[in-house]
Amino acid sequence: MTRFLICEHKGQRPDREAKVYHITDIEENHEVHLFENEELVEMRIYYKSSRAWGETTAIDTAEKWCLGLIH
């Protein structure tokens, strides 16, 4: 699997961080890694074939995690 880091988010909550990757092996999918206290809590994959997910949706997820809107 080939992953390219698109962006990193660190928000108002210093213990939270998120990284957004672009995956190019099969389709143009996006992967979001959600960290809390430097530990991977969750990984979300947005498959382009199942819906019209895009880079914007992945980045929005990362921002919402860092702002504390996702628990």
Label for each model-derived stretch:
Residues 1-37:
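Short N-terminal "domain-start" leader segments
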Residues 3, 7, 39-71:
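Mixed-charge, Lys/Arg-enriched low-complexity segments
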